[in-house]
Amino acid sequence: MPHIDNSRVAAMNKLDRYDLNILAELQRDARISNQELAERIGLSPSPCSRRVKQLEDDGYILRQVALLDRKKLGLTLTAYVHIGMDRHTPERFEHFESVINQCPEVLECSLVTGMDADYQLKVVVPDMDHYQKFLLGQLTRIEGVSSVRSSFVLNQVISSTQLPLQHLRS
């Protein structure tokens, strides 16, 4: 018998079409006014506001942020960095994660499987000189790092922060 993910079932049962439409609209533009949001999803402003507050309280909406233009800020080099660890112990992973969490150049850090690496990082820096300083001055100095392989982005074809919600619609 297949395993049923109860958290997914609970989420599907809890979120109705208004909630899903609110989430979709807020993913497109979190600065939308409550009045405009209510009009777009077909509710009056007061219930719309209550639903947004409930979605925040329930943890569906984690926070609202501004998306910055990295190129205008001089951050023109993006690298995906694959990190191999010398030992696969909880202590080694915890140490790496605590150190890498302090690196502002690292936008994402994922523990991965299926490749010759333990972690994949997304790193954004101004240029190759800054990347070299980050690599040699910080990354390779982290205790336990045994290998580093970098791939550089030539052209970002898709960049989105919007999560797909279709699987939750009935």
Q: What are the language-model segments listed below?
A:
Residues 1-170:
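A compositional/biophysical signature of low hydrophobicity enriched in polar/charged and small residues
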